[in-house]
Design a protein with these regions (language model features):
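Flexible, glycine/threonine-enriched loop-and-boundary segments that flank and lead into catalytic domains
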Residues: 203-220
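DNA-recognition alpha helix
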Residues: 19-32
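Basic, amphipathic alpha-helical segments enriched in Lys/Arg and hydrophobic/aromatic residues
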Residues: 187-190, 259, 304-375
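Helix-centered, glycine/charged polyanion-binding patches within enzymatic domains
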Residues: 266-336
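Basic, short loop/linker segments at the boundary and entry of helix-turn-helix/winged-helix-like folds
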Residues: 1-4, 11
Length: 375
């Protein structure tokens, strides 16, 4: 049942709570999840889906993607020849965080330290609860009014408040617990990082978030992790997806993407079509022919030109993954959550294609061609 609920969740782009409610009112969803009779009670608590995802991990979620490919092969929707040519590209899976600013990081970090100190019964000299809130509000007002000197002064004041609280806790606690120790380490990184620092902290609750720039005019920076995607060139079936941390160069991810496809599908492609981000033959697999999009079309045959034109077909797949299958904003925690959400989104996309294939077959076999709707 939980397997079916997760397929439906990412196929229809709904939350854990909504998929459980939809199960209760939709007999087709109940039949898909294995029920023989209609039920009038919720199948489980939405938190059960969270616990189940943690238990199976990303290795278990990879089986979801593998099963959609196997089902497509059994039903004749995916031919073996399709695995010969694939398209590979990368995108950014954004994390569910607020846009990071220095003032917000100082303010939120101080609040987190004060809250944890209260749980541990640590008597702080001063918490700066009222002063910190007032300084944060003033900073936002001054910045909005383009009064940068006043805004920077309030930002510096927020940084001072955070440093005072951090040092006060360190003086009074010699052996902090794991949670408090982690917060103190994050606060130290926030206080010491500068504009040109590497591996900066952009979120308190998601310190693994990276800042990635893909050259988009409408969105200069994206905060999350890079995702590598492999699709078949002909029919756009997703045969591989990986969440990559550390913002690696696209060319360095190609071998791992092909290896994951081999793990999921059971065979390696013969030809791979990529964009200019994959330049550098040193990073390409030796047994796979890699076609870069910078090759002159005049020197291509008609057949080669046709397949090269199909490379851009992966772009709408990325858009569908984000806007239709829960990958535009990841709410799952940690790096493992990034991997799980990317795999579930890919499995949901393939499952939607299988549903469309089933209904098109149903309309073809059971509805007469002469049938017309009355207007």
């Amino acid at each position: 049942m939980l397997v079916g609920l997760h397929y439906l969740k990412h196929a229809y782009n709904v939350s854990d709570e909504r998929v459980v409610e939809g199960y209760l009112e939709n007999p087709y969803w109940q039949y898909f999840c294995g029920n023989e009779y209609f039920e009038h009670d919720l199948p489980c608590d939405p938190t059960s889906l969270v616990k189940w995802r943690k238990r199976i991990g990303s290795e278990g979620v990879e089986k979801f993607l593998e099963e959609t490919i196997l089902l497509g092969q059994r039903e004749g929707e995916i031919k073996d020849q399709e695995f010969r040519r694939v398209n590979v590209d990368t995108t950014v899976q954004e994390k569910a965080i607020a846009f990071p600013t220095d003032a917000r990081l100082y303010h939120k970090m101080r609040q987190a330290l004060v809250k944890e100190a209260s749980k541990e019964n640590i008597q702080l000299r001063q918490s700066y609860k009222r002063k910190g809130k007032l300084a944060f509000i003033k900073q936002g007002r001054y910045f909005h009014a383009k009064q940068s000197k006043r805004a920077n002064k309030e930002t510096k004041r927020l940084k001072t408040y955070l440093g005072c609280v951090k040092r006060d806790i360190e003086r009074k606690v010699e052996n902090p617990n794991i949670r408090l120790k982690s917060l103190l380490e994050i606060s130290e990184r926030i206080l010491t990082q500068t504009k040109n620092s590497k591996n900066k902290i952009y979120s308190i609750h998601a310190p693994e978030v990276e800042c990635i720039s893909k050259g988009k005019s409408h969105k200069r920076y994206e905060f999350g992790c890079k995702v590598s995607l492999v699709t078949t060139s002909k029919s756009n079936w997703i045969v591989g997806v990986q969440a990559l941390h550390g913002n690696p160069y696209d060319g360095h991810t190609l071998k791992d993407a092909i290896n994951q496809m081999e793990k999921v599908v059971g065979r390696r492609p013969k030809e791979v079509y990529v964009d200019l981000g994959y330049k550098g033959k040193d990073h390409h697999p030796e047994d796979v022919q890699v076609h870069l999009s910078n090759k002159s079309r005049k020197n291509m045959t008609r057949w080669e030109r046709m397949w090269m034109n199909r490379r851009s077909a992966i772009e709408p797949v990325i858009s569908h993954l984000k806007h239709d299958h829960n990958m535009i904003r990841n709410f799952l925690k940690g790096r493992e959550g990034d991997r799980i959400n990317a795999l579930f989104a890919a499995a949901g996309c393939n499952f939607s294609k299988l549903l469309r294939a089933f209904f098109s077959l149903f309309l073809k076999d059971y509805i007469s061609p002469s049938f017309s709707f009355a207007i």
